[in-house]
Amino acid sequence: MKKVLALVVAAAMGLSSAAFAAETATTPAPTATTTKAAPAKTTHHKKQHKAAPAQKAQAAKKHHKNAKTEQKAPEQKAQAAKKHAKKHSHQQPAKPAAQPAA
């Protein structure tokens, strides 16, 4: 922590790196009597790459439509016919005029 503080102070004051190195060289080095164990072997995990999906248009990505059911488009109607649903009146077709017997 003190080294970091000294580095920040030295950088702020604009001291040369040689003067800073001389200052930090006076700190006692740790003793070499301690033995360190070899670091554990690191295993690198490989990512499994997925197959890239087929490219689609932007609208096809957003709107998922069911391709299985192909529905027929309804017949186009006039605007008034869409708004006003007519009730079916039960009219029988007109009978032909009775012909006199000859």
Swiss-Prot record:
Residues 1-21 form the signal peptide. Residues 22-102 are annotated as: Disordered. This is Acid shock protein. Belongs to the Asr family. GO terms for cellular component: periplasmic space. Residues 22-58 form a propeptide. Residues 22-41, 91-102 have a biased composition (Low complexity). Required for growth and/or survival at acidic conditions. Keywords: Periplasm, Signal. InterPro entries: Acid_shock.
